Amino acid sequence: LSLRGEQRTVCESLIEVETFKLKIYGESQITFNNVNIKEFDVDVYGESQLTMQKGIIDYQSITAFGEGKINAVEVKNRKGKYRAIGEAIFRVNTSEHIKFTAFGEAELYYKGNPEIDKGFGVGASTINQIN
């Protein structure tokens, strides 16, 4: 799925799939009310916002280019890989493992007790637990 521009999109029904790829461009606001996804791959370009209200994701890989805001703190996630080029903000709920790589002033806020692997990065990125 690819979304562009400055639109607001709400997926009201349950998204239940093995693999879901999402690309967001511009200043879009995307909300998923409920998800059940095995592998979720997201690329965010610009100042877009992605919000997930509830659900389960086994593995998620999210890359933000710019000032993207990702709010997935209400979604139970086992493993996650988060990359930022810019000033992105990630809010996630991950139980086992997080890999976080940032170039810029990105922020990662996480719920759970995962192992944290901070990849190579440049800039003043921060990682904070929010339990």
Where are these regions (language model features)?
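Extracellular beta-strand-rich, repetitive "passenger/adhesive" scaffolds
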Residues: 3-6, 25
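Short "repeat-start/strand-capping" segments in structured domains, especially the N-termini
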Residues: 1, 13-22, 32-42, 52-62, ...
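Short acidic/polar N-terminal linker immediately downstream of export determinants
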Residues: 9-11, 125-131
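Solenoidal tandem-repeat scaffolds enriched in leucines and small polar residues
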Residues: 50-51, 64-70, 84-86
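Residues at the loop-to-beta-strand transition
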Residues: 7, 28, 48, 68, ...
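Glycine-rich hexapeptide-repeat left-handed beta-helix
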Residues: 104, 118-123
